[in-house]
Amino acid sequence: MSSTEPDALLGPADIRDLAATLGVRPTKQRGQNFVIDANTVRRIVRTAEVRPDDTVVEVGPGLGSLTLALLEAADRVVAVEIDDVLAAALPATVQARMPERADRFALVHSDAMLVTELPGPAPTALVANLPYNVAVPVLLTMLERFPSIERTLVMVQSEVADRLAARPGNKVYGVPSVKANWYADVKRAGAIGRNVFWPAPNVDSGLVSLVRRTEPIATTASRAEVFAVVDAAFAQRRKTLRAALSGWAGSAPAAEAALVAAGISPQARGEALTVEEFAAIAEHKPEVSSL
């Protein structure tokens, strides 16, 4: 069977038959919704601009719908799956549907949040239908741990997509927006209808594209130091930064001094700041004197 034949991919009947054979029911606990439409997974691969020399990491492959479409386009695919049954079944599905590409597939049976290394060449792309309940932490963790990932396309709940791609001043701009922007240029890349999933979710889905920054943000502060400011600023997002950062700085006057030194108004709110401005604040964290 050629990997370019339409029946190499999984359709609705294939998905349901495979699930029945395995005794699998998608669980809300793990945020699982399986994609049952071959056109949709091919669209995701096209939108992700997967190249023939790419090593793609996929998180939460499920029954393998997107995995097979990625194998059509990429050099290698590494799938990370936490579910015991799904992890055991996926290599056999790849072997059965795309035997000539099976040697280009690797499975890591693990929680993606615990993965610190992947087999084979360093990944160049992340393409995934992320489980909705862990989408943001998984995305940020993968971008942190695998700096070789240049391009990312993830399918997430629509409101999460909005948050990730939001710009300063937008009402949904927040912690995910800033942290994602630390690593990459982020934008919405389309919408996905509910009817391409089984079971059909109660929410809409969206695609988010992240292209890693060619140059890291120019700052002497570490990622952890910058993210600490971001977390503090949005923990009390309705407060001014002078008040919201008082715990981080040690006091409100100390927060004001750090803000002024960074060129930021103490009366501003976190939702107005760019990631570069958060980095500037982190550089001016007051020294805590030990008595």
From Swiss-Prot:
Specifically dimethylates two adjacent adenosines (A1518 and A1519) in the loop of a conserved hairpin near the 3'-end of 16S rRNA in the 30S particle. May play a critical role in biogenesis of 30S subunits. Belongs to the class I-like SAM-binding methyltransferase superfamily. rRNA adenine N(6)-methyltransferase family. RsmA subfamily. Its main location: cytoplasm. It catalyses: adenosine(1518)/adenosine(1519) in 16S rRNA + 4 S-adenosyl-L-methionine = N(6)-dimethyladenosine(1518)/N(6)-dimethyladenosine(1519) in 16S rRNA + 4 S-adenosyl-L-homocysteine + 4 H(+). Keywords: Cytoplasm, Methyltransferase, RNA-binding, rRNA processing, S-adenosyl-L-methionine, Transferase. It holds the Pfam family RrnaAD. Disulfide bonds: none annotated. GO terms for cellular component: cytosol. Its EC number is 2.1.1.182. It comes from the Bacteria. InterPro entries: KsgA/Erm (IPR001737), rRNA_Ade_diMease-like_C (IPR023165), rRNA_Ade_Mease_Trfase_CS (IPR020596), rRNA_Ade_methylase_Trfase_N (IPR020598), rRNA_adenine_dimethylase (IPR011530), SAM-dependent_MTases_sf (IPR029063). It comes from Streptomyces griseus subsp. griseus (strain JCM 4626 / CBS 651.72 / NBRC 13350 / KCC S-0626 / ISP 5235). It is found in: Cytoplasm. GO terms for molecular function: 16S rRNA (adenine(1518)-N(6)/adenine(1519)-N(6))-dimethyltransferase activity; RNA binding. S-adenosyl-L-methionine binds at residues 33, 35, 60, 81, 111, 129. SUPFAM superfamilies: S-adenosyl-L-methionine-dependent methyltransferases (SSF53335). NCBIfam families: ksgA. The gene is rsmA. This is Ribosomal RNA small subunit methyltransferase A.
